[in-house]
């Protein structure tokens, strides 16, 4: 598949409309600018063409994510990054075009945070494997994985499939957009925020490209 001219697909009216509707369905909290999902439609009506042109000319600049801590089952804290609703809209538009491309590379028995797949399917597959005589289950958690993702390595993997420089540029900009912690800005030179684009799994799809290809 030719992936050298994906930005025009991302900027198509149909794709942008679908992205807007998905962000509204996802709801979620406001980012650092305080804009709510309910305010997004009016904002895009006034500024949508400006955003499209900024993306087309590589001038779009994502805002920092807002740091939020949520409790983990083991008693610790998990850091989430909440993007602005406008950034979520752009991320969603990008993801809708990229996801079908990368889905073809993922392992058939990987069920986490993928379209048309769910935990119940994973359980059924595990039962099938147990019935085939497999008796071991290994539970592995990669400690602080999202906090330590190497940007250059991630973008190298990403670039093996995606050849559109405009798309590569905007994805990297989201990686280095920074984070606001108690009104203090911090650079993000490593790692990727959990939250935003796919708030239900708390991991942007470009991280799946890093860990999930077969």
Where are these predicted regions, by residue range?
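Conserved phosphate-binding loops in nucleotide/dinucleotide-binding enzymes
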Residues: 79-84
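Electropositive, glycine- and tryptophan-enriched low-complexity nucleic-acid-binding patches
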Residues: 91-109
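Duplex nucleic acid-engaging cores and interfaces of nucleic-acid transaction enzymes
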Residues: 86, 90, 127
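N-terminal alpha-helical targeting/anchoring segments
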Residues: 1-47
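Conserved polymerase palm-domain catalytic core
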Residues: 54-69, 73, 105-117, 121-214
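Amphipathic alpha-helical blocks
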Residues: 39-61
